[in-house]
Amino acid sequence: MKTILYILFAATMMVGCNNSKATKVFDSVDATRFAEVIENEQVQIIDTRTPEEFSEGHIPGAVNIDIDSEEFTAKVAELDKSRPVAVYCRGGRRSKEAAEHMVNCGLEVTELTDGILSWKGEVDK
Protein backbone atom coordinates (compact mmCIF):
# COMPACT_ATOMS: atom_id res chain seq x y z
CA MET A 1 0.00 0.00 0.00
CA LYS A 2 2.83 2.40 0.88
CA THR A 3 4.45 1.66 -2.48
CA ILE A 4 1.28 2.53 -4.38
CA LEU A 5 0.87 5.79 -2.45
CA TYR A 6 4.51 6.67 -3.08
CA ILE A 7 4.14 6.01 -6.83
CA LEU A 8 0.96 8.11 -7.00
CA PHE A 9 2.64 10.94 -5.10
CA ALA A 10 5.73 10.86 -7.33
CA ALA A 11 3.63 10.80 -10.50
CA THR A 12 1.54 13.75 -9.29
CA MET A 13 4.67 15.76 -8.49
CA MET A 14 6.22 15.05 -11.90
CA VAL A 15 3.08 16.08 -13.77
CA GLY A 16 2.74 19.23 -11.67
CA CYS A 17 6.35 20.23 -12.25
CA ASN A 18 6.17 19.60 -15.97
CA ASN A 19 3.02 21.67 -16.37
CA SER A 20 4.42 24.63 -14.44
CA LYS A 21 7.66 24.62 -16.42
CA ALA A 22 5.79 24.57 -19.72
CA THR A 23 3.52 27.49 -18.94
CA LYS A 24 5.69 29.79 -16.81
CA VAL A 25 8.22 31.63 -18.92
CA PHE A 26 9.89 35.02 -18.99
CA ASP A 27 11.15 37.27 -21.78
CA SER A 28 14.91 37.70 -22.24
CA VAL A 29 15.56 40.92 -24.14
CA ASP A 30 18.47 43.05 -25.28
CA ALA A 31 19.34 46.41 -23.71
CA THR A 32 17.33 48.43 -26.26
CA ARG A 33 14.12 46.49 -25.58
CA PHE A 34 14.81 46.47 -21.82
CA ALA A 35 15.00 50.29 -21.89
CA GLU A 36 11.59 50.36 -23.58
CA VAL A 37 10.13 47.98 -20.98
CA ILE A 38 11.29 50.05 -18.00
CA GLU A 39 9.84 53.26 -19.46
CA ASN A 40 6.54 51.97 -18.05
CA GLU A 41 6.30 53.44 -14.54
CA GLN A 42 4.43 50.34 -13.34
CA VAL A 43 7.49 48.12 -13.92
CA GLN A 44 9.39 47.06 -10.81
CA ILE A 45 13.11 47.15 -11.69
CA ILE A 46 15.14 44.58 -9.75
CA ASP A 47 18.95 44.35 -9.65
CA THR A 48 19.99 40.89 -8.43
CA ARG A 49 23.67 41.71 -7.86
CA THR A 50 25.40 42.11 -4.51
CA PRO A 51 24.96 45.38 -2.58
CA GLU A 52 28.59 46.22 -3.40
CA GLU A 53 28.00 45.80 -7.14
CA PHE A 54 24.75 47.75 -6.87
CA SER A 55 26.53 50.70 -5.20
CA GLU A 56 29.04 50.86 -8.07
CA GLY A 57 26.22 51.74 -10.45
CA HIS A 58 22.68 50.62 -11.21
CA ILE A 59 19.81 51.41 -13.54
CA PRO A 60 17.81 54.37 -12.19
CA GLY A 61 14.82 53.25 -10.14
CA ALA A 62 16.22 49.77 -9.50
CA VAL A 63 15.82 48.02 -6.17
CA ASN A 64 18.61 45.70 -5.03
CA ILE A 65 17.51 42.16 -4.18
CA ASP A 66 20.71 40.10 -4.04
CA ILE A 67 19.92 36.62 -5.38
CA ASP A 68 22.62 35.13 -3.16
CA SER A 69 21.23 36.62 0.06
CA GLU A 70 19.16 34.68 2.57
CA GLU A 71 16.36 37.25 2.17
CA PHE A 72 15.98 36.81 -1.60
CA THR A 73 12.91 34.57 -1.52
CA ALA A 74 11.16 36.68 1.14
CA LYS A 75 11.85 39.92 -0.74
CA VAL A 76 10.57 38.48 -4.02
CA ALA A 77 7.40 37.41 -2.20
CA GLU A 78 6.86 41.06 -1.20
CA LEU A 79 6.85 42.29 -4.82
CA ASP A 80 3.52 43.49 -6.23
CA LYS A 81 2.19 40.65 -8.40
CA SER A 82 -0.12 43.06 -10.23
CA ARG A 83 2.90 44.92 -11.66
CA PRO A 84 5.48 43.55 -14.13
CA VAL A 85 9.11 43.03 -13.14
CA ALA A 86 12.26 43.87 -15.09
CA VAL A 87 15.29 42.05 -13.70
CA TYR A 88 19.01 42.25 -14.42
CA CYS A 89 22.42 41.40 -12.99
CA ARG A 90 25.99 41.92 -14.21
CA GLY A 91 26.16 39.51 -17.15
CA GLY A 92 22.84 37.66 -17.29
CA ARG A 93 23.35 34.44 -15.33
CA ARG A 94 21.95 35.52 -11.96
CA SER A 95 19.04 37.42 -13.48
CA LYS A 96 17.96 34.34 -15.46
CA GLU A 97 17.96 32.31 -12.25
CA ALA A 98 16.03 35.06 -10.46
CA ALA A 99 13.55 35.37 -13.34
CA GLU A 100 12.79 31.64 -13.18
CA HIS A 101 12.08 31.94 -9.47
CA MET A 102 9.95 35.06 -9.96
CA VAL A 103 7.71 33.57 -12.65
CA ASN A 104 7.16 30.55 -10.41
CA CYS A 105 5.95 33.04 -7.78
CA GLY A 106 3.38 34.39 -10.21
CA LEU A 107 5.21 37.47 -11.49
CA GLU A 108 5.38 38.68 -15.10
CA VAL A 109 9.12 39.04 -15.79
CA THR A 110 11.38 40.57 -18.43
CA GLU A 111 15.11 39.82 -18.07
CA LEU A 112 18.06 41.79 -19.50
CA THR A 113 19.90 39.12 -21.51
CA ASP A 114 23.50 40.28 -21.09
CA GLY A 115 23.08 42.20 -17.85
CA ILE A 116 24.19 45.70 -17.01
CA LEU A 117 27.37 45.12 -19.03
CA SER A 118 25.20 45.59 -22.13
CA TRP A 119 23.32 48.61 -20.74
CA LYS A 120 23.83 51.82 -22.73
CA GLY A 121 21.51 54.04 -20.68
CA GLU A 122 21.92 56.15 -17.59
CA VAL A 123 23.37 54.66 -14.40
CA ASP A 124 22.87 55.90 -10.81
CA LYS A 125 25.54 55.54 -8.14
State the predicted function of each range.
Residues K2-I4, T12, C17-T32, V37, ...:
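Rhodanese-like catalytic fold shared by cysteine-dependent sulfurtransferases
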